[in-house]
Amino acid sequence: MADARRAPLKDQTDVSGARVLIVEARFYDDIQDALLEGAVAELKAAGATHDVLTVPGALEIPAAVAIAIDSAEAAGKPYDAAIALGCVVRGETIHFEIVSMESARALMDLSVARKFPLGNGIITVNTDEQAWARAKPGDLNKGGDAARAALAMLRIKRRLAKA
């Protein structure tokens, strides 16, 4: 497995106080715990707050993000960014392809259409071993990567809004 490569982000626009939504699919509780741990650590380091919304599986994540964004906006407490966390392990049918591709496409569509910072931390793997290597904060830390991506996009949005 390749080592994780993370170039330091040069844009250090302040994101402290940002309100971030984490939507997690708890299909694999133990793997999800590791993904969530990595994401939360990154948000805390950036001074962001977060809410966690749990859904049954990865296919439900995009709709839950959209519903939560609208509800928070209507309540006058909008989210600044969102993070999608989940795990899809390949099985013997095409269900893996459907879940992984459709959840990714829906998240991308949502992010682009709404111009909304979103980090996709739905890991797609062939084995449990691959899932653990990607989920653990001490290894590839894909939960942390998703949080960093969401915060990076939020920095871009905030910086360009000031321009």
Swiss-Prot record:
Pfam families per the UniProt record, alphabetical: DMRL_synthase
CDD domains referenced in this protein's UniProt entry, alphabetically: Lumazine_synthase-I
Enzyme kind, highest EC tier: transferase
EC number(s) on file: 2.5.1.78
Record's keyword terms, sorted: Riboflavin biosynthesis, Transferase
Entry keyword annotation includes Transferase: yes
Residues engaged in binding (2S)-2-hydroxy-3-oxobutyl phosphate: E92, T93, R134
GO biological process, one term: riboflavin biosynthetic process
Residues given in the record as 5-amino-6-(D-ribitylamino)uracil binding sites: F27, A58, L59, E60, C87, V88, V89, N120
Catalytic activity: (2S)-2-hydroxy-3-oxobutyl phosphate + 5-amino-6-(D-ribitylamino)uracil = 6,7-dimethyl-8-(1-D-ribityl)lumazine + phosphate + 2 H2O + H(+)
GO molecular function annotations of the record: 6,7-dimethyl-8-ribityllumazine synthase activity
Active site per the UniProt annotation: H95 (proton donor)
Pathway(s) where this gene product acts: Cofactor biosynthesis; riboflavin biosynthesis; riboflavin from 2-hydroxy-3-oxobutyl phosphate and 5-amino-6-(D-ribitylamino)uracil: step 1/2
PANTHER family linked: 6,7-DIMETHYL-8-RIBITYLLUMAZINE SYNTHASE (PTHR21058:SF0), 6,7-DIMETHYL-8-RIBITYLLUMAZINE SYNTHASE DMRL SYNTHASE LUMAZINE SYNTHASE (PTHR21058)
Similarity-based family: Belongs to the DMRL synthase family.
Known function: Catalyzes the formation of 6,7-dimethyl-8-ribityllumazine by condensation of 5-amino-6-(D-ribitylamino)uracil with 3,4-dihydroxy-2-butanone 4-phosphate. This is the penultimate step in the biosynthesis of riboflavin.
Name the UniProt record assigns to this protein: 6,7-dimethyl-8-ribityllumazine synthase 1
